[in-house]
Amino acid sequence: MKRLILMLIVGAMLFALLSCSGKNNAPDGKTYTDNYVYTMWKTSDTSTYTLYRINVLSATGTPVCPDPLCGHDTNECPFYGINTEGSGIVGSGIYYLRGSVPMQHCRQVCRFDLESGKLAILYENSAATIAKLFVFDDYVYFLELVGDGKESPTYTFRLMRYGIHDGKTADLGNTGAAKNTDIYACVDGRLYWEDHDSASCFSTDTDGRNRVDGDRLSDRTRSGNYSVMIENVQPADREYINMYTCNVVSKDLTTGETQTIIRNNPSFPMVYDGKVFYYRFQEEPLLIGYIVDEESNERKQIFDARGTKLYICDFDGQNDRLLCDIAGSGYLFGITNSMLWSSGNGEYYCTTLISYRQSEDGQTVERGNNAIVVINIKTGSYKIADME
């Protein structure tokens, strides 16, 4: 089983819901709409991930990089070394971090213009690491890790701000933030921060000052009069390839009452366009292969708990229904949180599909090919994307 886990688990799962926005307000007040959703992807003939956009009408995915000859593996590519954490689209611009090492040691804050195909480096500091990015309608904030220059340096996080409207960068100084601190909202002239390790929270003004400890928005993930949260995260049975289950709880923002709307969800749900996307634990689990237990040398069956069905409901648990079933496609649903952004068309959602195969020696189950599926969230119709 240890061997199976090492082969199948890549990266770490965030203990949070992912929320996306279907509209993007340009600095000139216009809305940039191009019927695309965005995700990171690599084709079978390369080892390099790059940013793709998928046309939701044709289900065709192409690299966002405008150079058809680019291998996406050098600094000449605008998305080489991209760190998508905290990135976002405002108007026709994608705002993201970039560095010499992909997903690490970011030195640049960048904007890629989807209309012109041009990259602009908004801020660069070769002597510091940019650790966090937070994109809002008016400002892009980022935390810069800076040493004090001593032989045994002490590092602090300096808050920086780039104005989307005026193009000016401001050094807001040391606000006492740490690497595990996020700015999760900018509302009515206040920044709302949350420290994930200590579960503490506070707010500041948009200059990072006038701190109020304990101040938080009532709920971070909401739609209408309801918000949703995750509770009771539990490890799944060893017979399942899925590693955990959780309950999804709905909260009435007027009364404060909560109710569990989804139980035993074998993945963290996706929150998008006022809906909750989730899987149901399979009553008849899908057999995906066999493993040989390293301790007992016994050959055992291994199952997938997510299966081929994706469900959808409102934040209050109403209008709960099967959205689509991809049985017969040759794939199973993977983790729901794979779509980065939607630029203009909120009727579509994309996520990763996965497959499994028995290893050549018959000792374990391996991951097969992946795919991207584009789903119409109103009709449930779907297409497997052709990723060029």
Descriptions of predicted regions:
Residues 343-388:
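Blade-level signature of beta-propeller repeat domains, shared across WD40, Kelch, NHL, RCC1
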Residues 62-65, 69-78, 118-124, 168-174, ...:
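A short beta-strand motif characteristic of beta-propeller blades
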